UniProtKB/Swiss-Prot annotation:
Family: Belongs to the DNA mismatch repair MutL/HexB family.
Gene3D superfamilies: 3.30.230.10, Histidine kinase-like ATPase, C-terminal domain (3.30.565.10), MutL, C-terminal domain, dimerisation subdomain (3.30.1540.20), MutL, C-terminal domain, regulatory subdomain (3.30.1370.100)
Phylogenetic placement of the source organism: Bacteria, Pseudomonadati, Pseudomonadota, Gammaproteobacteria, Enterobacterales
PANTHER family: DNA MISMATCH REPAIR PROTEIN MLH, PMS, MUTL, DNA MISMATCH REPAIR PROTEIN MLH1
Name under which the protein is recorded: DNA mismatch repair protein MutL
Biological role: This protein is involved in the repair of mismatches in DNA. It is required for dam-dependent methyl-directed DNA mismatch repair. May act as a 'molecular matchmaker', a protein that promotes the formation of a stable complex between two or more DNA-binding proteins in an ATP-dependent manner without itself being part of a final effector complex.
UniProt source species: Escherichia coli O127:H6 (strain E2348/69 / EPEC)
Cited SMART domains: DNA_mis_repair (SM01340), MutL_C (SM00853)
Example GO BP: mismatch repair
Length: 615
């Protein structure tokens, strides 16, 4: 066969083999494009796990009509223009091949409008030569990308897709990672017409712990130690779970970001593992959410087809910097910025600048680790023993770890380069309905809140009851039923059996499935909020309530169930309160605008302030 130039569609399909692994890969590429466009809100609609439809809609800057055809062409991008740009990448995308690759294995439609244009335009590519057609459309400022029938023309690739649930779980995980990277962006995820995730933008200076708790869970939030570690152009922020309380479930939380880009980096994982090795068992893994900021000239992100890995020009420096940052927090036992219990919190301590790991000129000189005397000994916190001084040398570790570490550090010596000016990112506004910031827990079940300088008290059990009612109230589709491992069989009277039969359709909408015979009823499934309840008590009470009713409305039954559920928490913690309020704000936004009686009470501090001033 003679050498020949491949047709554009075939070339794009070959490239898609690296870029488009599964529906989650498409979602990642398209959402990253939205973030690069300055979007502050991204709506993601998925159908059948992404095999049928992936729709990404944003409010970014949009694409000009004249550039729509180029947007679907290979190696066409607005992110870089020269080799110098490639050596200091600050955007998430830069290769200009994602849209072309995706359009070659799906039916892709791109609709966009810029603020300068009066109308929107729609583009799609088709045919062997991937000719682009552009036509007028209706669309607000921003961009919408629709990907239909993924892998429809490559049956072999489609055959390797997993079940709908598995593919959507991969998409969900990608969105979780992106939501942790950009707290300033609102992200909504829907599957088969149902909203699954709603991550509201966190205002500047707001509580990032709300989104952290929603994604990583309350258990991680309660054990999280905050990190703020800096030297020169290296900055490490985020949270690491206390290794003394790490569980197998927590160990699955390992999120790392380099200059805002999600990564799976062996060097970073090794540094964190080494810092925690004295407190972790041989089969345990650390849990962390960490953000590393580094001079873009000192990291190469163009080393992996899906951009999951990076290469640091000074691996030893980065490794030691992260190691020292995590180790210092574990030694000091710094607590998360939000107090997670009702005890008085010690005064905040100044976080020192790392001078042991960094050397003098950490980018221009080779990273040679010299013994350095400890320059700082952390002051003991109130009520705790003094923290150990900085270590002069790294502790020993296993031979296999050392071999991996040695291989990771075999990188060429860097060349001296001028520092690139830090990019000025446009401020992204984020407005959301909120009860405010949780200050502390009062009397075990009330949260003291602050919003715009106003103080209020919120009853957590009441908020929990409203949340349960929202979770139980069916919308356009019935509430999802959770099958019981051991069905519950109860004896009922004739009157109760008759009431159950009349209420069967209403109960089915609430996710309660049962079968009845002559004198018994067998509960086979209940909705998720009921799974942790004592059904031996709750279900007979529910049957008794139904026997007294003549009309069976799902909303009324959901309200009764919500009022009779036992609270999950006898003693509320800060983390639990933050998680609850985040869920209430997401599912019950009407409560924020018009709080019902018994939920929220304003607290007037003016008399107390006046009394203090009078003194």
């Amino acid at each position: 066969m003679p050498i020949q130039v491949l047709p554009p569609q075939l070339a794009n399909q070959i490239a898609a083999g690296e870029v488009v692994e599964r529906p989650a890969s498409v979602v990642k590429e398209l959402v990253e494009n939205s973030l690069d466009a300055g979007a502050t809100r991204i709506d993601i609609d998925i159908e059948r796990g992404g095999a049928k439809l992936i729709r990404i809609r944003d409010n970014g800057c949009g694409i000009k009509k004249d550039e729509l055809a180029l947007a679907l062409a290979r190696h066409a991008t607005s992110k870089i223009a020269s080799l110098d740009d490639l050596e200091a990448i600050i955007s998430l995308g830069f290769r200009g091949e994602a849209l072309a690759s995706i359009s070659s294995v799906s039916r892709l439609t791109l609709t966009s409008r810029t603020a300068e244009q009066q109308e929107a335009w729609q583009a799609y590519a088709e045919g062997r030569d991937m000719d682009v057609t552009v036509k007028p459309a209706a669309h607000p400022v921003g961009t919408t990308l629709e990907v239909l029938d993924l892998f429809y023309n490559t049956p072999a690739r489609r055959k390797f897709l997993r079940t709908e649930k598995t593919e959507f779980n991969h998409i969900d995980e990608i969105i979780r990672r992106i939501a942790l990277a950009r707290f300033d962006v609102t992200i909504n995820l829907s599957h088969n017409g149902k909203i699954v995730r709603q991550y509201r933008a966190v205002p500047e200076g707001g509580q990032k712990e709300r989104r952290l708790g929603a994604i990583c869970g309350t258990a991680f939030l309660e054990q999280a130690l905050a990190i703020e570690w800096q030297h020169g152009d290296l900055t490490l922020r985020g949270w690491v779970a206390d290794p003394n309380h790490t569980t197998p479930a927590l160990a699955e939380i390992q999120y790392c970001y380099v200059n805002g880009r999600m990564m799976r980096d062996r060097l970073i994982n090794h540094a964190i593992r080494q810092a925690c090795e004295d407190k972790l068992g041989a089969d345990q893994q650390p849990a962390f959410v960490l953000y590393l900021e580094i001079d873009p000239h000192q990291v190469d992100v163009n080393v992996h087809p899906a951009k999951h890995e990076v290469r640091f020009h000074q691996s030893r420096l980065v490794h030691d910097f992260i190691y020292q940052g995590v180790l210092s927090v574990l030694q000091q036992q710094l607590e998360t910025p939000l107090p997670l219990d009702d005890e008085p919190q010690p005064a905040p301590r100044a976080i020192p600048e790392n001078r042991v790991a960094a050397g003098r000129n950490h980018f221009a000189e080779p990273a040679v680790r010299e013994p350095v005397a400890p320059l700082y000994t952390p002051a003991p916190a109130s009520g705790s023993r003094p923290a150990a001084p900085w270590p002069n040398a790294q502790p020993g570790y296993q031979k296999q770890q050392g071999e991996v570490y040695r291989q990771l550090l075999q990188t060429p010596a860097p060349m001296q380069k001028p520092k690139a000016p830090e990019p000025q990112e446009p401020a992204l506004a984020a407005n959301s309905q909120s009860f405010g910031r949780v200050l502390t827990i009062v009397h075990s079940d009330c949260a003291l809140l602050e919003l715009d300088g106003n103080i209020s008290l919120l009853a957590l059990p009441v908020a929990e009851r409203w949340l349960r009612q929202a979770q139980l109230t069916p919308g356009e589709a019935p509430v999802c039923a959770q099958p019981l491992l051991i069905p519950l069989r109860l004896k009922v009277s004739g009157e109760e059996k008759s009431a159950l039969e009349k209420a069967q359709s209403a109960l089915a909408e609430l996710g309660i499935d049962f079968q009845s015979d002559a004198q018994h009823v067998t509960i086979r499934a209940v909705p998720l909020p009921l799974r942790q309840q004592n059904l031996q008590i709750l279900i007979p009470e529910l049957i008794g309530y139904l026997a007294k009713q003549s009309v069976f409305e799902p909303g009324n039954i959901a309200q009764w169930i919500a009022r009779n559920l036992m609270s999950e928490h006898a003693q509320w913690s800060m983390a639990q309160a933050i998680t609850l309020l985040a869920d209430v704000e997401r599912l019950c936004p009407q409560l924020v605008k018009t709080p019902p009686g018994g939920l929220l009470q304003s607290v007037d501090l003016h008399p107390a302030i006046k009394a203090l001033k009078d003194e």
